[in-house]
Amino acid sequence: GILTTPVRKTEDGLETIVSVNYVAPYMLTRQLLPLMQPGCRIVNTVSCTYAIGRIEPDFFEKGRNGRFFRIPVYSNTKLALLLFTQELAERLQNQGITINASDPGIVSTNMITMQAWFDPLTDILFRPFIKTPAQGAATAIHLALSDEAKDRNGCCYANCKKRNVSERIRHHAQQKQLWDDTEILLRQKGIRF
């Protein structure tokens, strides 16, 4: 995923964070589905920030400018990816293909540096909780390979354990609408599945 500032648009007119963090995984998954057989597993990378995300009517285009507004846009994309994970799990429930979400936690990458005056302070506060890239990848690997996760579907995991997702997210009113809106958007761009 990415967390950029200032707002950038793709050549298709989508906000870049939305395009990379949500639309690209959606498209890749949808394009690979016809090749998948029972036993295949799909793992999407989300973030605990999905809990503060919102899906608004201008989700695909808007974005916001400035250092402090990229976090809400990022959170919105992670909510969208979790909703996609849940919706696809429902659609694939009888096909033997599982799809789950992995929350790697705060991982020591360039993405966590905001180039802001408060970075040294946040580094001191969060450093004890920051994972190495290998530690961050462990949950996704667990979902992809472990026996424990082979029959799980539509779940969110963190630290290699199933996370309890709030009722509001598990039964999100916009889950099916987001799927439909994404399909419409991609058809408008000439992409069909």
Question: What is the role of each PLM region?
Answer:
Residues G1-Q115, Q188-F193:
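Rossmann-fold NAD(P)H-dependent dehydrogenase/reductase core
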Residues K9, S166-I169:
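Short acidic, glycine/proline-rich loop/turn micro-motifs
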Residues R54-I55, R168, A173-F193:
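Non-catalytic terminal and boundary segments that flank Rossmann-like NAD(P)-dependent oxidoreductase
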Residues F59-R67, A116-L125, C160-R163:
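Short glycine/proline- and charge-enriched loop/turn segments
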Residues T77, A101, I124-R163, R170-K176:
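C-terminal helical subdomain
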Residues E87, T139-H142, D181:
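Generic recognition of well-ordered alpha-helical segments
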